[in-house]
Amino acid sequence: MPNVSVKVKWGKELFKDVEVNTDDEPVVFKAQIFALTGVQPERQKVVCKGVTLRDDSWANFTLSNNALVLVMGSKEEDLPSAPVEKTKFVEDMNESELASALELPEGLINLGNTCYMNATVQCLKTVPELRNALLDYDQSSGGGTAGGLTAALSNTVRAMDGGGAGACAAAAARLLQALHAAAPRLAERGPGGALAQQDASECWTEIIRALRARLFMPGTDNKSMIEKYFGGTLDVEWVCSEADEPTTKSEESFLQLSCFISQDVKYLQSGLRSKMAENITKMSESLGRDAVYTKTSKISRLPAYLTVQFVRFYFKEKESINAKILKDVKFPLDLDVYELCSPELQERLTPMRNKFKELEDANVESSLAARNKNQGDNKDIRKKKLMPYWFENDIGSNNSGYYRLQAVLTHRGRSSSSGHYVAWVAKGDDWLRCDDETVTPVSQDEVLKLSGGGDWHCAYLLLYGPRVLEVPDEDEPMVTDVTEDVAKDPPTALA
């Protein structure tokens, strides 16, 4: 009988009619207990009829209707409250009070080495088109494990939009279960039976793969939303260095670019460039043996959202681990990939780039004119409109080559299977650090310090979104002394 109603006793508190589905993993039940008691799953000891519940199995833990389940464990912060209500300053607030005061988004509870999943979700959630598609997803549409993972992510996004800590905990537990079903390797456990730490890049890839199969563009012939907004193409040429062979041309698709970290790479841009021209040994039909080829790649389509992976891990055979390269590689808040593009794409990017340049020049002139004024502060402010960031015939593309950083996924530790993953996401002009369930404001300078070089958090995955051109709306009348909130999502082609 998978569905039962039980009583949960924690200290002096008794929670009646708690619905439990034993088809779910035990971690889902522990997430429910967290929602009721505030006790983190890793601090819980759950007992029924003298049997302790394990994290990975319901074995010997039999539940029946009205069974009494005992929970032992304390909250991380069981501090006595002050007897008198008094004004609190930001520096005196705890994490929950700070989140409420600053209207911070919900975090996701760590269910036992699940920080890699939490950080991935927080980064992907910054894409408004993806978030909207998940909120609109038909969870009854099936689709096997990919459909189950997409539905679970949809539920998680809904819970994070005001559902509260309890709803987020339960949603995260079901998301973990769906992730394990779609990618069983991520369900590996350590010697003690606890969930093993996983590579966040693998989690990112698995989630994107599922979304690619289940999210489609409205009004199209089942075109993948992921391919349109995250996918690009490369024009590739192969030239043999050892024989006079004809140049071989092909086209390759990508969902992310890689920045390989060598001794000479100090900046993201140089790491990306080095990947675009590389020597590769492969079989030569004319020579009848392996030969060295020069592979040259140029981007022929830019996606709206560009994912970049720092290739920081390599297999260390002696210790059988994916060891980490700690080298400092700087990355910018604003990224221009024009030089990585094919001549044909560069020509198509030029008109929008010229508009950016014209606006920047006009802003400089206005600033200089304002400084030279000897009169009051009154300004004429024309209402603004946001220009589309995509080509008219290619929704989900980037029409300028300009990007702005909107999420960073970092790793702290010495191997991909250990340490800790955290998401750092942009909110308007500000930044937030999403460390599992704890969300705190940080500065841009703190984000730029994530470039590596030590044991602090190192950038592992970067997510860049399109820079959106904001121009005066010529159809709107001139107004005076108007202040507008310009911290808004970019225009989207998805309804």
Each language-model region and where it sits:
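UBL (ubiquitin/ubiquitin-like) substrate-recognition surfaces
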Residues: 1-495
